[in-house]
């Protein structure tokens, strides 16, 4: 389906490196939530785009610049991992610098994997970064089991995190996004969650990599490359975020870019032309803000 739509007008972290030496910090208290506003430029034609649902927002104040079916409940596929990452960073008692306990169940996950093995020695923060780069379902389960003890407990924490970030109609049942009855979100909720995360420097750092070398302590390091062609395309200002695909969800993408100090986020759900649509929609958004 092709859509052409009219416009809809309407965290700073204390020094903590994304490594095994990272210090535990209270990320929620460190978030700078002061919105940045910018006057929208009128009379700019919206681009033609595709997909079942879409929303384009100004990440600094959550202003919706363009949307289509943005509140429709849909399968999010691996865009779920944005919530998994945010929950891992915000959950009380999480020690990101400690070695993860990797169970046989986590290591058995398919089909997109980081490649961890049961008993591997690698810090939790590096599992999180590897998850975002490789879209590893195994890494997502490792995070869930280490942060909350079980997938059901972590899913409850994910839903708390989503609400904290401004989501109003989402229900997450697993950390990886594989299809499960009752696991759903909306494009608008994903945009709000991503925008909340992008106010946290550590989150921003972990969602922007083209590749990452996993520093296993018990075997040779392994390098994984991003599944996100939007990041690899070097779109001007591109700095995240996450891909997703399952047969039920179709092709999904959360893409973010920052120009002139302004960050925009576009969410595309079930969009076979996501790599073409994301740059066009972001270009439109920056023009709306008077940024080229």
Range-by-range predicted roles:
Residues 3, 9-18, 22-188, 192-201, ...:
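Active-site-adjacent loops and short helices of periplasmic peptidoglycan-processing enzymes
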Residues 1, 93-95, 273, 285-286:
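Alpha-helix capping and helix-coil boundary motifs
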Residues 168, 179-292:
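Domain-terminus/edge residues, biased toward the C-terminal soluble/receptor-binding domains
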């Amino acid at each position: 389906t092709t859509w052409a739509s009219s416009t809809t007008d309407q965290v700073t972290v204390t020094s903590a490196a994304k490594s095994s030496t990272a210090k535990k910090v209270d990320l929620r208290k460190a978030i700078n939530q002061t919105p940045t506003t910018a006057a929208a430029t009128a009379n700019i034609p919206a681009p033609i785009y595709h997909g079942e649902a879409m929303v384009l927002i100004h990440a600094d104040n959550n202003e919706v610049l363009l949307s289509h079916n943005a509140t429709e409940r849909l399968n999010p596929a691996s865009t779920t991992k944005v919530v998994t990452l945010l929950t891992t960073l915000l959950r009380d008692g999480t020690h990101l610098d400690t070695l993860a306990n990797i169970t046989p169940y986590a290591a058995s996950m398919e089909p997109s994997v980081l490649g961890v093995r049961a008993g591997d020695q690698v810090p939790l923060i590096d599992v999180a970064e590897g998850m975002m780069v490789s879209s590893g379902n195994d890494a997502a389960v490792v995070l869930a089991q280490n942060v909350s003890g079980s997938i059901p407990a972590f899913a409850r924490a994910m839903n708390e995190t989503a609400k904290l970030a401004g989501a109003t109609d989402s229900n997450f049942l697993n950390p990886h996004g594989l299809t499960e009855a009752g696991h759903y979100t909306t494009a608008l909720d994903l945009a709000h969650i991503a925008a909340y995360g992008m106010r946290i420097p550590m989150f921003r750092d972990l969602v922007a990599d083209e590749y990452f070398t996993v520093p296993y302590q018990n075997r040779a390091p392994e390098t994984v490359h991003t599944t996100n062609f939007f990041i690899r395309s070097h779109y001007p200002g591109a700095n995240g975020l996450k891909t997703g695909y399952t047969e039920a969800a179709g092709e999904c993408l959360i893409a973010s870019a920052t120009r002139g100090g302004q960050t925009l986020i576009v969410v595309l759900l079930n969009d076979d032309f996501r790599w073409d649509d994301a740059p066009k929609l972001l270009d439109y958004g920056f023009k709306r803000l008077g940024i080229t």
